[in-house]
């Protein structure tokens, strides 16, 4: 368990990955906790190269697979040093120590999210972030263009409806005026022309009966 020694022979062992550890949790503490469920072969806590502090996760090796499964079921969600542990089966083997990796090939990088998962390079993260940003921008642009097109279609439909209503009102007013003019012309044609006073007097005189000779003599005397 000392960090200066090379890793032991872990072939045939079952490894558990323990996440969400505090910086003060030691390998001895983990061994005491996990030995309740079976024989522990190895406990390894990766540390930072420069600060030498714990990276917040560890690997616990069991000689028997059934003991490892029992420990995983019991310790997943348990609280240790004020932290709720997350325990799962490790996917790959334990990485070698830093001093031992100088002689051999460079070790694989193991992230804190899952054992055996390679940490993504910052370039890939930047690319993924830029892609997500471009996607969000394109989505926002498409939504903005859709709202613009909808507002345009609405304004067009409103203007067309207004023009149609104006045309209808104009046609109605013109038809009403035409009907009024027609009725006036008909009433004028039906009414007889007015007669003057002279014509009426002459007609009344012509209609009066002729006077007798006796009436004429009396008038002359």
UniProtKB/Swiss-Prot annotation:
Gene3D superfamilies: 3.30.70.330
Post-translational modification: Extensively phosphorylated on serine residues in the RS domain.
One GO CC term on file: spliceosomal complex
Biased composition annotated in UniProt, kind: Basic residues: 117-171, 179-189
GO molecular function, one term: RNA binding
Ranges of residues in domain RRM: 14-92
Region (Disordered): 91-221
Record keywords: mRNA processing, mRNA splicing, Nucleus, Phosphoprotein, RNA-binding
Pfam families linked: RRM_1
Domain of life: Eukaryota
Location of this chain's protein in the cell: Nucleus
CDD domains: RRM_SRSF2_SRSF8
Gene Ontology BP, a term: mRNA processing
Function: Necessary for the splicing of pre-mRNA. It is required for formation of the earliest ATP-dependent splicing complex and interacts with spliceosomal components bound to both the 5'- and 3'-splice sites during spliceosome assembly. It also is required for ATP-dependent interactions of both U1 and U2 snRNPs with pre-mRNA.
Family according to the record: Belongs to the splicing factor SR family.
Protein known as: Serine/arginine-rich splicing factor 2
Organism encoding this protein: Gallus gallus
Gene (UniProt): SRSF2
């Amino acid at each position: 368990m000392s960090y200066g020694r090379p890793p032991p022979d872990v072939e045939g062992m079952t490894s558990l990955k323990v996440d969400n550890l505090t910086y003060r949790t030691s390998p001895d503490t983990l061994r005491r906790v996990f030995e309740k469920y079976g024989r522990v072969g190895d406990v390894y806590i990766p540390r930072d190269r420069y600060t030498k502090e714990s990276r917040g996760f560890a690997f616990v090796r069991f000689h028997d697979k059934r003991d490892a499964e029992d420990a995983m079921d019991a310790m997943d969600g348990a609280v240790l040093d004020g932290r709720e542990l997350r325990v799962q089966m490790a996917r790959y083997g334990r990485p070698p120590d830093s001093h031992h990796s100088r002689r051999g090939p460079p070790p694989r990088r193991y992230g804190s999210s899952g054992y055996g998962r390679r940490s993504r390079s910052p370039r890939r993260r930047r690319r993924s972030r830029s892609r997500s940003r471009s996607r969000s921008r394109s989505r926002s642009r498409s939504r903005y263009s859709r709202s613009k097109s909808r507002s345009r279609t609405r304004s067009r439909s409103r203007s067309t409806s207004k023009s149609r209503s104006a045309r209808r009102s104009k046609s109605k007013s013109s038809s009403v005026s035409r009907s009024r003019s027609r009725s006036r012309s008909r009433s004028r044609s039906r009414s007889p022309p007015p007669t003057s006073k002279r014509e009426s007097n002459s007609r009344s005189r012509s209609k009066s009966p002729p006077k007798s000779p006796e009436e004429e003599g009396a008038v002359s005397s």
